[in-house]
């Protein structure tokens, strides 16, 4: 190597190391009483706050997070959306990458800040996401994004302003909230023999209220046609906006268990008790960044499907699940539990105070949520603006509906990656058919026809360290194995299992890699290969510009119509990765599967501090 070449190498290494820095964080997890919606219950605090602190890093930073468990129960922390390339021991999934952190103990997570974008972190121990351990993550990118912003505006000042706005966004962690802890909530379902999913509030950045607008008002807020299409004539919601818990359309079946709706405590399904508290306020400055502001939304919901809008303001959706997309302009958007969205808003309206409407848009409950976007200096102004959504999330006009993002409609969910990134065409190397639904009880969920993923699966012998522990056992039905360097298709079928022909959506999240949704259609999957399905139903597939995400929604099916989806990904990140529904009740009920990606290139050099024996 010449002297000049060596000099260039030294310079390159210097700047690489100068850019990537080591960032150390400390998270102390405690359990105490709080009242984020004005009604007291016990919940999880992180460093004394709820929700957990926002963590901001630069791409490729070396991250070290020490988690101290100061509760009387187990905990882990999952870094949702981070690929954990070469660090599968830091994914934070009990039974796969680690043992749970016992009370009084600590665990140190080490990983690269990658990929850039909007992510989040949360507990992955049983249903404890319900209890409040979640916070936003922002990884600021190295690269230039001029090509992204130029799709929104060709003005050079605007492009620079949007880059600056995206570098320092507003963070909105949106969560649903119940008066019951996760353990209490799950016990209500198992005691009553009914899947219970009624909530009390929608919170934004840990703030919200309990609204009781009256049963007649809530009945009028039902999505048009929902009762007629899905439920018996005359079905009415409760004064909390919830459907009757014992409806066959909700509970499925028949199941060989006894339904005991009388064991559902008061105020779970009905008996609304209002509380005034406070809603989150987002102060924005139109004098900064040429009037552009970026907002990062995290759907830290456990059951609800969230819709958001800002009165009188359109927005450009430019990032989903930490992956940049070709921007599109909307006035409202629907987020599924687990997803993250980033939007760019032009502050071009009359300075004032504008309502942010953030209701539950799912068919589970009519439930409103609110925050305020306030132009700086207008904190004392009266609210102004045009509403795009009603209390229950219905569009206020046909134009609003035309300009809204719906993940279950392929014509609006055509959010292709930027820069272009598409999967291999033709057949994959491996195909796995996963049949989703309920088995045996309304709260038991499977991903492979019959097996339920236990919440303590392999907790003592995590699969990262014991990848063959389930072989020759019935539990091997909970494990998929793939080869490194292969293209894999995951085919998800819903609404075909006995007793589960009426199926609510599932929000399917894969750890360790993003997937392209290349196909979506109605009916029963009865093809010998994806390639055969493409030949027979080309209109149901897209391999040129499919979306790329880590969380996808399956179809809502009431009335027996089956649906399937096809997700494709490339195996280049060996490790044990959980693939599961991000609705906490469904995961607690068994809707998960362990995917051991790259078993032929399994991590061999695991740092000694992470070894278990």
Swiss-Prot record:
Pathway: Pigment biosynthesis
Binding site for Cu cation 2: 80, 122, 582
This protein's name: Laccase 1
Name of the top EC class for this enzyme: oxidoreductase
EC number: 1.10.3.-
UniProt record similarity statement: Belongs to the multicopper oxidase family.
The organism's place on the tree of life at top rank: Eukaryota
Gene (name only): Mlac1
Segments forming domain Plastocyanin-like: 29-142, 171-359, 468-598
Stretch forming the signal peptide: 1-20
Residues binding Cu cation 1, per UniProt: 78, 509
Cofactor note: Binds 4 Cu cations per monomer.
Subcellular location: Cell surface
Cofactor dependence: Cu cation
Single GO MF annotation: copper ion binding
GO cellular component, one term: cell surface
Primary location class: other
This protein's UniProt keywords: Copper, Glycoprotein, Metal-binding, Oxidoreductase, Repeat, Signal
Binding site for Cu cation 3: 124, 511, 580
Lineage summary: Eukaryota, Fungi, Dikarya, Ascomycota, Pezizomycotina
Role summary: Laccase; part of the Pks1 gene cluster that mediates the biosynthesis of an anthraquinone derivative pigment that contributes to conidial pigmentation that provides protection from UV radiation, heat and cold stress. The polyketide synthase Pks1 produces 1-acetyl-2,4,6,8-tetrahydroxy-9,10-anthraquinone though condensation of acetyl-CoA with malonyl-CoA. The dehydratase EthD and the laccase Mlac1 further convert the anthraquinone derivative into the final conidial pigment.
PANTHER family membership: LACCASE-RELATED (PTHR11709:SF488), MULTI-COPPER OXIDASE (PTHR11709)
Glycan-carrying positions: 74, 256, 279, 444, 468, 484, 526
Keyword Transferase carried by entry: no
């Amino acid at each position: 190597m010449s002297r000049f070449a060596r000099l260039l190498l030294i310079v390159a290494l210097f700047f690489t190391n100068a850019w990537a820095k080591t960032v150390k964080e400390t998270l102390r997890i405690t359990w105490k009483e709080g009242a984020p919606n004005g009604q007291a219950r016990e919940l999880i605090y992180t460093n004394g706050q709820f929700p957990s602190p926002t963590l901001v890093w630069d791409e490729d930073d070396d991250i070290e997070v020490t988690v101290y468990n100061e509760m009387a129960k187990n905990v882990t922390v999952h870094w949702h959306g981070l690929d954990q390339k070469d660090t599968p021991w830091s994914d934070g999934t009990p039974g796969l990458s680690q043992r749970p952190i016992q009370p009084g103990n600590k665990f140190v997570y080490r990983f690269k800040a990658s990929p850039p974008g909007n992510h989040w972190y949360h507990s992955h121990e049983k249903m404890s996401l319900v209890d409040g351990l979640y916070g936003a993550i922002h990884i600021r990118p190295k690269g230039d994004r001029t090509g992204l912003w130029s799709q929104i505006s060709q003005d050079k000042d605007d492009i620079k302003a949007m880059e600056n706005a995206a570098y320092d966004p507003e963070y909105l962690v949106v969560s649903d909230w119940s008066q019951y802890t996760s353990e209490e909530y799950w016990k209500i379902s198992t005691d009553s023999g009914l899947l219970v999913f009624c909530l009390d509030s929608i919170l934004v950045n840990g703030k919200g209220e309990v609204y009781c607008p009256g049963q007649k008002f809530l009945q009028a807020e039902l999505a048009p046609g929902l009762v007629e299409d899905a439920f018996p004539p005359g079905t009415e919601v409760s004064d909390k906006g919830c459907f009757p818990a014992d409806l066959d359309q909700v509970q499925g079946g028949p199941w060989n268990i006894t339904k005991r709706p009388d064991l559902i405590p008061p105020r779970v399904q009905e008996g609304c008790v209002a509380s005034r508290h406070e809603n989150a306020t987002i102060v924005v400055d139109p004098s900064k960044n040429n009037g552009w502001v970026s907002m990062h939304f995290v759907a830290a919901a456990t059951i609800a499907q969230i819709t958001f809008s800002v009165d009188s303001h359109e927005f450009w959706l430019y990032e989903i699940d930490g992956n940049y997309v070709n921007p599109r302009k909307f006035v409202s958007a629907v987020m599924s539990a687990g997803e993250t969205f980033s939007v760019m808003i032009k502050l071009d309206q009359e300075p004032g105070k504008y309502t942010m409407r953030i209701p539950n848009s799912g068919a589970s409950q009519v439930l409103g949520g609110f925050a305020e976007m306030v132009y700086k200096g207008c904190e004392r102004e009266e609210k102004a603006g045009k509403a795009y959504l009603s209390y229950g999330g219905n569009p206020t006009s046909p134009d609003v509906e035309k300009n809204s993002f719906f993940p279950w409609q392929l014509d609006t969910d055509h959010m292709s990656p930027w820069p272009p990134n598409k999967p291999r065409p033709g057949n994959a190397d491996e195909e796995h058919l996963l049949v989703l639904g309920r088995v045996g009880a309304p709260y038991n969920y499977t991903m492979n026809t019959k097996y339920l993923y236990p919440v303590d699966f392999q907790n003592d012998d995590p699969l990262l360290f014991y990848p063959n522990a389930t072989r020759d056992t019935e539990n091997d039905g909970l494990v998929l194995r793939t080869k490194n360097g292969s293209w894999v298709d995951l085919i998800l079928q819903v609404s075909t299992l006995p007793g589960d022909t009426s199926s609510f959506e599932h929000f399917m999240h894969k750890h360790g890699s993003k997937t392209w949704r290349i196909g979506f259609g109605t009916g029963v999957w009865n093809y010998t290969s994806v390639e055969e399905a493409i030949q027979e139903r080309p209109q149901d597939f897209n391999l040129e510009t499919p979306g790329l995400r880590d969380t996808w929604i399956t179809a809502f099916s009431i009335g027996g119509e089956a649906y399937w989806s096809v997700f494709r990904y490339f195996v280049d990140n060996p490790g044990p990765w959980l693939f599961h529904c991000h609705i906490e009740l469904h995961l607690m009920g068994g809707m998960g599967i362990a995917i051991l990606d790259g078993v032929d290139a399994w991590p061999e050099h695991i740092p000694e501090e992470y070894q278990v024996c």
